[in-house]
């Protein structure tokens, strides 16, 4: 389930998945689980707002929470992120939600040029965490982070 037209004209709903992307430890992901796909658990946005984000389509948008501190100061524990699941190739580089073989993580991800097999550099914003590399075929990229919300 991904973003869709809401009952009110001029609005769209983005499903909030009841799982978290780790910005530190690891979390396993099951996007097919009934808990993750609760149709009543969604955020509603004005369609005009979507245009300001540079997005025209809503069908590939999803929301999840961030846990941990590896992406501080950019993303903090309990932030909610919107990801575009149509963007699964890190070119250009950016912040992605991915399953790196250990668990679901939010990380800065980029393709390392001139590598065979093709490799990804996966890094945190927080310098207390080391960057690491994975073969692109070892990683399942869920989507690019395009927006976030934070409690004050």
Regions from the language model: what does each represent?
Residues 1-77, 149-151:
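Short, positionally conserved secondary-structure boundary motifs
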Residues 50-152:
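Acidic/glycine-rich C-terminal interaction modules and beta/coil loop segments
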